[in-house]
């Protein structure tokens, strides 16, 4: 019951507050106020839980309160009640199924948007496509030696999705990034070898040359086409030993 277990956080928070302080005898301590405070703490945690599930399950607040009351009065033990255990398991199964369906929908949409974007991009002026399927447009070729996959490059870049959303940008951070070229996604490794130091290039990376069906975190869905604008600031060849 991964989602359900969030409720135990309330108890842990109270324990942490109490154990972190030393209380002297205080005859003015208001137990009713303390009881209410604990109730609001648990209620806040419960509200977060209910809100996080609302797209999938519409809970009945009155029944939630009934359950709380019964548990507090010792009328029910969730650890021993098989009916409640089965209900909690069904909640988790429903949430997992909904999460899977949502992920599949997002991946499908990302693929469709990417396919459409690449088809249109391919028609653009000066756009070329490599044998692997990498699409690119060179703004400036740069000068010097051809970049190798084992070289360390220093670049400024902006990465976008087909819908225009920027998911990462060293330009916005104001801090270039340095890395060995064969340690990144295939599209980058291939794309930067098409220019030299000082070069500027835009490349469009199909999912199979990027993060594929896995995606990358919350910002890059599975099956995403990636658009990068890159400027090569410096190139350091791998030293020969």
From Swiss-Prot:
Superkingdom as given in the UniProt entry: Bacteria
Record field: transmembrane: none
Keyword Isomerase: yes
Domain PPIase FKBP-type residue range list: 150-241
InterPro entries: PPIase_dom_sf (IPR046357), PPIase_FKBP_dom (IPR001179), PPIase_FKBP_N (IPR000774), PPIase_FKBP_N_sf (IPR036944)
Its EC number(s): 5.2.1.8
Top EC category: isomerase
SUPFAM superfamilies assigned to the protein according to its UniProt record, in alphabetical order: FKBP-like (SSF54534)
Catalytic activity: [protein]-peptidylproline (omega=180) = [protein]-peptidylproline (omega=0)
Keywords associated with the record: Isomerase, Rotamase
One GO-annotated biological process of the protein: protein folding
Signal peptide: none
Function: PPIases accelerate the folding of proteins. It catalyzes the cis-trans isomerization of proline imidic peptide bonds in oligopeptides.
PANTHER family: 39 KDA FK506-BINDING NUCLEAR PROTEIN, FKBP-TYPE PEPTIDYL-PROLYL CIS-TRANS ISOMERASE FKPA
Protein name: Probable FKBP-type peptidyl-prolyl cis-trans isomerase
Organism: Haemophilus influenzae (strain ATCC 51907 / DSM 11121 / KW20 / Rd)
């Amino acid at each position: 019951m991964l989602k359900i277990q969030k409720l135990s956080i309330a108890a842990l928070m109270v324990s942490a507050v109490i154990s972190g302080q030393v209380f002297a005898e205080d005859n003015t301590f208001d137990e009713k106020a303390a009881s209410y405070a604990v109730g609001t703490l648990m209620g806040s945690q419960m509200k977060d839980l209910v809100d996080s599930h609302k797209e999938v399950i519409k809970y009945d607040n009155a029944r939630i309160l009934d359950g709380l009351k019964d548990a507090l009065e010792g009328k029910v033990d969730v650890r021993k009640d098989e009916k409640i255990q089965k209900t909690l398991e069904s909640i988790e199964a429903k949430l997992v199924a909904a999460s899977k369906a949502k992920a599949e929908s997002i991946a499908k949409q990302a693929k469709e948007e990417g396919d459409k974007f690449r088809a249109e991009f391919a028609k653009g002026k000066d756009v070329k496509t490599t044998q692997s399927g990498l699409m690119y447009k060179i703004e400036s070729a740069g000068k010097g030696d051809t970049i190798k996959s084992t070289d360390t490059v220093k670049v400024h870049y902006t990465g976008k999705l087909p819908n225009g959303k920027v998911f990462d940008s060293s330009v916005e951070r104001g801090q270039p990034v340095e890395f060995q070229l064969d340690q990144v996604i295939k599209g980058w490794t291939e794309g930067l070898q098409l220019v030299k130091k000082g070069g500027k290039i835009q490349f469009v990376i199909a999912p199979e040359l990027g993060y594929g069906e896995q995606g990358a975190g919350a910002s890059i869905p599975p099956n995403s086409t990636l658009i990068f604008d890159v400027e090569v600031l410096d190139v350091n060849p791998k030293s020969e030993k």
